[in-house]
């Protein structure tokens, strides 16, 4: 265990060293930079804890609100947890790409407020979707026959309904960029041509809605949390725009 911990610690310091030396990262606005650092630290903390048999996702991930392991603070902590390297990489890459633009446009306080509130909103929408699933499919049962686990109690099953990740907030960030800079051109792999940001956002939202409604077997992605982040982002941006116009100023 000692050698494993030492290796993880070395990898962590190497990664943070590379990140801190990366010129664009050094020039990044404070809130965006610190959000990425916090997410990376929590991710490596999760890996270290796993080596000691501790599942941080069980404490910091967002449980279904009727589960015994639910804690209201999880509506905040869950957005700093990630389920794997690709999960955190793509989320933080999006924050790295679009976060600085929004922070420079809005200022650090408004950007941080937007980030956290949309993450909470995404979690609330996910909770609502899970509640509908519970009412329509689970509430009449006391046990569940789950593949790979056998027959388990309903409380055990509800505690397994855990959401982690900043994806809801990331989708809100994409929405904000599309609303503030709708005609900016973006190159999206694998498309060989650029598309306007507004079409990019609409396309992503449509894909998430389709995937959420399809509810394919084995799909563990919280699609409605992504849409929830976008919904709360839309409401907040429209509110800010209306408030700015009422104050005699124009808000982009």
Predicted regions mapped to residue ranges:
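A detector for small-residue-rich transmembrane helices and their helix-helix packing motifs
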Residues: 2-252
């Amino acid at each position: 265990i000692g050698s494993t911990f030492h290796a993880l610690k070395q990898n962590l310091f190497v990664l943070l060293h590379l990140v801190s030396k990366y010129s664009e990262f050094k020039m990044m606005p404070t809130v965006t930079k610190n959000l990425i650092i916090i997410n990376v630290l929590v991710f490596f903390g999760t890996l270290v804890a796993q080596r000691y048999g501790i599942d941080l996702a069980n404490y910091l991930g967002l449980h279904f609100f009727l589960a015994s392991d639910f804690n209201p603070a999880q509506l905040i902590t869950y957005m700093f947890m990630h389920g794997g390297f690709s999960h955190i990489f793509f989320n933080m890459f999006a924050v790295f790409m679009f976060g600085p633009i929004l922070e420079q446009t809005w200022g650090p306080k408004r950007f941080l407020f937007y980030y956290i509130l949309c993450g909470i909103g995404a979690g609330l929408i996910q909770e609502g979707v899970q509640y509908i699933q519970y009412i329509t499919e689970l509430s009449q049962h006391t046990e569940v026959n789950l593949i790979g686990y056998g027959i388990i109690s309903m409380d055990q099953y509800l505690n397994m309904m855990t959401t982690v990740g900043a994806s809801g907030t990331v989708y809100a960030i994409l929405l904000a960029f599309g609303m503030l800079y709708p005609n900016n051109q973006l190159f999206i792999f694998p498309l060989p041509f650029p598309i306007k940001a507004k079409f990019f956002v609409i396309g992503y939202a449509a894909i998430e809605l389709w995937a959420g409604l399809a509810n394919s077997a084995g799909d563990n992605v919280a699609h409605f949390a992504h849409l929830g982040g976008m919904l709360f982002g839309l409401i907040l941006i429209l509110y800010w725009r209306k408030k700015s116009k009422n104050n005699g100023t124009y808000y982009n």
